[in-house]
Design a protein with these regions (language model features):
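A shared catalytic/ligand-binding motif for oxyanion handling
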Residues: 1-112
Length: 112
């Protein structure tokens, strides 16, 4: 299972969306956490349909305007359980469906 993090500084731009999609496909990444997305809920819906069809996502958009943390997961390979969602952190349990290996993951974005 491969995991990636990217502080994207604006995931609403098509070039950046394409870059993350290319990285995920080229490196066979099953989970990618994108920080500082600046996405709206509508923008996220469009992104999921266009670039990550069939993937699931967890975000903290409901706790902070401007969408700070977005976790994208391939549900065929990884099970993700969100445990706590706060404005600066998402805590979750990640389980690999192939190996049954499980670990806790915290994705943090600190405000300036």
């Amino acid at each position: 299972m491969k995991v990636a993090f990217w502080n994207i500084r604006g995931f609403h731009l098509p070039l950046k969306q394409k870059g993350v999609e290319a990285l995920v496909r080229k490196r066979d990444i099953g989970l990618v956490a994108v920080l500082e997305t600046k996405l709206t809920v509508n923008g996220l819906d469009a992104l999921m349909k266009r670039r990550f069809k069939g993937w699931m996502q967890v975000n903290n958009f409901g706790t902070h305007a401007g969408g700070r943390i977005l976790i994208l997961v391939d549900p065929m390979r990884i099970q993700l359980e969100a445990l706590v969602i706060l404005p600066q952190v998402i805590h979750c349990r990640v389980t690999c469906k192939v190996s049954s290996c499980s670990f806790l993951l915290s994705c943090v974005y600190g405000f300036n």
